[in-house]
Structure formats: C-alpha cells, structure tokens
C-alpha cells in the first residue's frame, strides 16, 4: 500500500498575475472550497487559544447545512489552549494531519501524530498544546450533541487511523471502503467522522441521496465527484460541503482517493424548523 499522506491549506497568497479561473463554488445544494483559496487572509483566531489560527470551512447555516462546524487548525510551537471548547453542549472530533500535539483528556496525556483521532463528548475536560518545534495542523469537527433520555453519553477515546482496519463495501473487490472509528449501530453517537478510501479507478456506483449532511475533506488523491447536477473535479486539500439530500457519486482518479467524512446519524428527524 502507498504511504499515507494528508493534504492541507495552501496558505500564503497567489501571485498578482494569477488568473481567476479557480473551482470555488457555492450553490443551493453544495459548496466546493478548493485548497487554493484557503489562504492566510481568511484565517481567524479563537478565544483562549494562543499562537493558533483556523480556517473555518463549515458552520451551521439556516437552509443549507445546519448541524456542524469544521475547522482546520494550525498551532505554532508553544501554542495551544487550556480552555479549548466554550460550549458545554458541543461534542468534537480532532484529526491530526501534520505535526504532533499533546492532548490531555480527562487528566490523561496523549501524543497525537498524523492520523491521530480523538473523540470528545460534550462536557469533556481537555487541553491541547504543541510542545514540538514544528507547526501542527488538525481538523476539528464540532456538533451540538442531541441527548436522548435513557441513552448515556458516548465515552471519550483516542486512536490513530493506522490502528483501525478499513471495512470494504460488499461487491467492490476491496476498492471502496470506510475506516470507521465508531460502530454504526452505537446510538449513543449522533455523528460519525470517518475516512473513506477509493482505490484508483473505483467508483461510488449510484447517486447517494439521503438525509445526512456531509463535510468531505480530501486527504489525498483526486477524483471527479458528482454533486447535485454537476460533475466537479476535486483534489487533495479540497473541501466539499453538502446539505441534506444533495445527490453524490464519485469516480476516483489514477491514485488512491481518500477523504475525511462527517455525517449526522442515529436521531429522529426534527419536526420543526
């Protein structure tokens, strides 16, 4: 198997001679935020974080995607936070794509390297710092947890994708699979953040059209992706943001194609707006 790689934002600025022929688009059903538009001037700081900047690539928006936010966070050496999450109802997933981070979760220390994954239930006590000599980057997916009477909160856990086997879809000859960090039938969880892998030339062979919202961040490779009525070229470092019921399908390119996938799951549909 080829070495695992993880793409990140371009940062910097394009040259003044650059042409405006990029792929960024925002439609009624989906958005594509290419890597090339994730530049320094669109980053933000966060309260109680030091030497840190974030690209906020998704947030709840009425009439579009309403359930989650997603950040790409870059922490310089010596940076981090002792008070990272200000919303007591928020659950989160951290997924490290570059560098090394020191996570303390419920009093226990963990070292997160590329591929490192941490699930943080609402109310979890955690801190995060970059104690190394190089910048670190991670994805932070946040959702307001939907508690259900009689169902306990999910437990915090830390792992690395290298320690989790890919589960291949049936009848795909091991060419389309998912790295699942949570069992699908564990109804304590109301969101999944997985990694989808398509081997070269593999396809999603039908237009998935379903209630789940999606954030898809391309970790490596390239593909042609069906989004609503359009076929869109995407590559490592691009982000696709889908509202509920946006049709989607995929043809993978000449190399392995992988993306980090958010979806909301395991709860009744709300009956009010």
Q: Language-model segments: what does each one mean?
A:
Residues 1-67, 137-191:
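A short, N-terminal "cap"/entry segment at the start of jelly-roll beta-barrel domains
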Residues 51-60, 69-88, 179-184, 194-210, ...:
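Conserved short histidine dyad/triad with adjacent acidic residue
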Residues 88-102, 106, 211-228:
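Glycine- and acidic-residue-biased ligand/ion/polar-headgroup-sensing regions
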Residues 107-122, 228-244:
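Short acidic-glycine-tyrosine-enriched beta hairpin
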Residues 109, 122-148, 235, 244-269:
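Ligand-binding loop in jelly-roll beta-barrel domains
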Residues 158-225, 232:
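Surface-exposed interaction/gating patches
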